[in-house]
């Protein structure tokens, strides 16, 4: 993915993610910043795990890329992007919209809806973590985080940022052009560094 212009496949996947996230909002889903915390950090470097679950159980989380993946992980099959729909999203939409037979009003649906909650409440993939706006009260519900170990995730992310910094000019400068692409990439590295939760 070290290119000035992304391949169509990557752009299509990115657009699908943004569209699905926004459609989630139109269906009533709020940001679920606690979703990505349910994944063990090591699982985010596992090809079989990321193939099945991607980076988060909810597209309503801001887990846009697998920044803990290390050189060689992608070649082994580790997925770097969010799911089309996560298991939490499917569950939440089912809970909110599924028709429950033999009920004629919302009060009669309560028993079934409560049972569905009880069934999943011990599974961390179905945890909801509201977006925190003014201060971080719950460290498991942060934006732009991955996995259940923020210290190790931050250290892996910093390792990747160091690789980028060592190659910034090589990957972003076109001979004969200005350094604006290099400057833009540098600003993105600084921005990513500011998002690390350690």
Residue ranges of each PLM-predicted region?
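Short pre-active-site segment immediately N-terminal to the catalytic Zn-binding motif
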Residues: 2-18
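Active-site recognition of the HExxH zinc-binding catalytic motif
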Residues: 17-32
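A short, hydrophobic secondary-structure junction motif
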Residues: 15-21, 59-64
